[in-house]
Amino acid sequence: MAKKNYGQVYNILGWGDPYFTVNSHGHLAVKPHGRDTMSGQDIDVHSVIHRALATTITTNDGDKKPQFPMILRFPDVLKNRLDSLHAAFHGAVDSTGYASRYQGVFPIKVNQNKAVVQDLVTFGHGYSYGLEAGSKPELLIAMSCLAKAKPGAYLVCNGYKDADYVALALSARAMGLNAIIVLEMEEELDIVVEQSARLGVEPVIGVRAKLLTKIPGHFGSTAGKHGKFGMLADKIYEVAGKLKKMGKLHWLKLLHYHVGSMIPTTDIVYNAAAEAAGIYCALVKEHGATGMTTLDCGGGLGVDYDGTRSGSSDMSVAYGLEQYASSIVQAVRLTCDDNGVPHPVLCTESGRAMASHHSMIILEALSAIPEPQDEEDTHHRLLSKIQDLSSKQPRTAHTVNGGGGVDAMHSHAVELKKHGIEMYKLAKKLSKRVTGDANGIYNYHMNLSVFSLVPDFWGIGQLFPMMPVSRLNEKPTINGTLVDITCDSDGKVEKFIRDAVTLPLHPLDDAAAEHGGYYVAALLSGAYQEALACKHNLFSGPTLVRVESAGGGGAFKIVSVELGPTAEEVIGTMRYDVKNDISDVIEKVATENGVWPMVEPLMKKGLTTMPYLNDYKPPKTTF
């Protein structure tokens, strides 16, 4: 009799296709080559964890074992994402008769980790795949990594710039790199002209367009005419005129736009590309910029975190790679053909869609205890509160201040916000109460810091698909929330994909101990989380494990295991001199009190290990 598979409880067929599955052992497994993964090549995540834990790492402080939490990286998945993106664009170019090519870049801000950036440059060599930088540190990383790239790979220099940034970008051109300085505002042109003359290096520049096309929701907040970056079309044409007067219009090669991360539908993808292509054509035809070669469509290629393919929220997109590529190629081709302008090279800065799938965060369960119910907040009383609040609509702007006015409108907006927040809190509490009344809710204490591992959850409400690593052939019987070990009430994950307020989990019983522990994976987490992580309570980054496929039979090899920062290293980032300010002071006081022999080994262990809990007893559920 076939064992049951409860993977679909977590919608793994939605968000996980084609990289994640549940194997015959009831374990989460990775399909390292996506749809090209052959039978027997799936990598068992549970086995990876236990092999990693058995690894001995030699450090200056002696041999150590890995600690939780940990990030598992699968570079084979990263390569497949890159190959799939290029296949999608190459297919769209070939099928439409587009008379140029696609040549993309990876925005370093998405994941600055050395292995990730270097892998992408290596994997993308045949595609002339390049990098995008938005700061001087990122530019230095790009310059070093692209030294090994195929000549001609783009080094797109975005972000606000000072003279040092511009000079560094010009030095990259002097090194033979294809660095393009993208102007965010007109004033940056003066810096480029000045530094070019000083260094004797002729630049290649681009301009960033502020499009009128917008996307809804959180990720569209920096787009449109009121957006933070770029210039409106008229200002771009002024820049072209300024270059023409200086006899430097040949410097201008690229037009860049970015309407926001996580574009939800292909209609918006198409409209943005068509609008930008119109500006590109005007620069070529009406403003004499005949040397233009490239349209950089920026980021926005989304990830379907909730697996619905609906595009109806910030967590979902209603398309795949092929539809995205086709929308851009078709829009630019038709616009350029209508204007009689040669088709430009198409570039995208697709970071989230490249990096998300290749990395997962592994969280260790420490204990599980029932969440106490507030006896006064029965679901009937909560529903009554919601109905009562709904009947008390905030005053209109007109009644606030006679005829209204700016102050009245602002006051009304503030009241609406407070009203909405209170309604949301009550509705959320009602949802949890109904769930708890039916089955009870358990708080699973996890060896993690929300602020260090999934900061986007805390910061913007970003949701990641989460599921147990093992026991997926057993029905999960507990409604759980995840509680971290920080001293902060925000350190809790109690919202999940598909509008769930709990995550189906298993009891922490003898079966959990038999599996060597109970682990929950946060998936599609390879973009932004490490870069945005903070040090709340001085918890640090995780252990990093690099895993590669080793052929059939589920074979894999652990290429490297890197421990996360030690307590000593984290304390040092807060400007403490660990020896003078910490070690020497503790030694002095402990010696004076005659307890140094006891304190010394404890202090040493505390400083030289990761700040998370270590050597924790097997987890249990309190019923």
Curated annotation (Swiss-Prot):
Its cofactor is pyridoxal 5'-phosphate; Mg(2+). Keywords: Decarboxylase, Lyase, Magnesium, Putrescine biosynthesis, Pyridoxal phosphate, Spermidine biosynthesis. Expressed in stems (at protein level). The modification N6-(pyridoxal phosphate)lysine is found at K109. The keyword Transport does not apply. Pfam families: Orn_Arg_deC_N (PF02784). GO terms for biological process: arginine catabolic process; putrescine biosynthetic process; spermidine biosynthetic process. It catalyses: L-arginine + H(+) = agmatine + CO2. This is Arginine decarboxylase 2. It comes from Oryza sativa subsp. japonica (Rice). The gene is ADC2.
